[in-house]
């Protein structure tokens, strides 16, 4: 999923946003963030044919709350897009602080932003942020998706976040493996998991 998100994000920045200059701000203590940033950079450079298109790269650690130093440095390069794959709390704070500094670049992030808490932390500042995700709850894509959406809404009286769909699918994959293994023994279940084919979950096949 990370290679897909990184390359799609880069393609969107280049093809749809017509970005010429991109800055990266990474959660350097998070392998997810570092990996996603690398996939994005590699693909954007490939598309643009210009290694200098990545005008700045800044790092921070999980739990940081003040990003003024990184953002002040980024601002001087006037990027069109800032790719900021990280946890939703830090990412929302980054965007808020960027707007306070007068940075107008479009922000792109990964699926960790696809949660209501991102909007709660970021408020109006995160409006217009671009998010890649593996699940959309507006239109069911198959019967499993339809059943999941109905059950979640009936139980919790709200829309499900993408992570809930992923957890639901993980449960279904294991349940399917147990049935095919006809056993509760871990080794047999593991073997059945490796043989899973054409699984249709709420987030797709």
Predicted segment positions?
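Extracytosolic ligand-binding ectodomains
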Residues: 1-205
